Amino acid sequence: MTHQPQQSPQFFLTAPSPCPYLEGQQERKVFTHLVGDKANEINDLLTQGGFRRSQNIAYRPACEVCRACISVRILAGEFEMTRNMRRVWSQNRDLIGRVHKAQPSTEQYALFRDYLDARHRSGGMSDMTVLDYAMMIEDTHVNTQIIEYRRRGPDSFMSAKGDGELIAVALTDVMADGLSMVYSFFSPHMQERSLGTYMILDHIERARAAGLPHVYLGYWVEGSRKMQYKIRFTPQEHLGPRGWQRFEG
C-alpha cells in the first residue's frame, strides 16, 4: 500500500534582530509557509495558536528572554462600545465598507504610501514598492479579502460607482471562528475620524453579523505605546501558557 505524505507544516527560526517595539530588545520569530490545499485550515489553527499571517507565511514571536508580545482577540458577541467609541462610530456613519477579492489597485497603493510616509516613515515597510504592496495583498493561499472604506455617495445604495474617495483599507482573513485583521491603513489627513478605531468597530459588527465569535487583532506589546490601543476593545482574550484567558481591562 502506498501512503501519501501528510502536508504537515515545517517550522523555521529567524536569527535575532532588533525589536521594532521595545528598545534594547532582540526579537526572533518561528515561521512556516502557508501553501497547498490545507493552507486555509493550517492558517486557522495557527492563528488560534498565536500566529500572524504575512503573505504566505505564518509567524509568531520566539524571543529568548522577552514575552511581551501577547496575542489578542476580541469577544465580538459580548463587546459593547464605550462612549468615545460610539462617538467614533457616529462620526463615520457617512462611510461605506465594501468587501472585495484580495486584489491590489493603484488607488490603494497611493493611500498606503500616504499612510506610511505620514505615520511610519522609518518603519520596516517604509520602502515598499507597488510590487511589494501587490504581493502583500494577493500572495496568499488562504481565505482573505479587502474591505475598502469610502464616503457614501447619493447612489451608493444602488451601485459602488457612486461611492466617494478611498479613505481606509483593511486586509482581513476570514476564519472558521472569526475575522483576523492582517493589515489596515487609512488617510493620515483625517485624524478627527479615528479611522483605525472605526475599522476595528466595523470588523466587530461584521463578525457579529456572520455569527463569528472573535476578531483577532494580532499582538499587544506591553510597554509599547503604539500597541496600547488594542486593549481598549473589551471584553477580549489574551493567549498565555494556559490558553486563551479572559481580559476585561
From Swiss-Prot:
Compartments in which it is found: Cytoplasm
Catalytic activity: N-terminal L-glutamyl-[protein] + L-leucyl-tRNA(Leu) = N-terminal L-leucyl-L-glutamyl-[protein] + tRNA(Leu) + H(+); N-terminal L-aspartyl-[protein] + L-leucyl-tRNA(Leu) = N-terminal L-leucyl-L-aspartyl-[protein] + tRNA(Leu) + H(+)
Keyword terms, alphabetized: Acyltransferase, Cytoplasm, Transferase
Enzyme class of the recorded protein, top EC level: transferase
Record GO terms (molecular function): arginyl-tRNA--protein transferase activity; leucyl-tRNA--protein transferase activity
GO BP, one annotated term: ubiquitin-dependent protein catabolic process via the N-end rule pathway
Alphabetical list of InterPro entries matching this protein: Acyl_CoA_acyltransferase, Asp_Glu_LeuTrfase, N-end_Aminoacyl_Trfase, N-end_Aminoacyl_Trfase_C, N-end_Aminoacyl_Trfase_N
Gene Ontology cellular-component terms listed: cytoplasm
EC number: 2.3.2.29
Nucleotide-binding found in the keyword field: no
Function: Functions in the N-end rule pathway of protein degradation where it conjugates Leu from its aminoacyl-tRNA to the N-termini of proteins containing an N-terminal aspartate or glutamate.
Family per similarity comment: Belongs to the R-transferase family. Bpt subfamily.
The protein's name: Aspartate/glutamate leucyltransferase
Origin species: Brucella canis (strain ATCC 23365 / NCTC 10854 / RM-666)
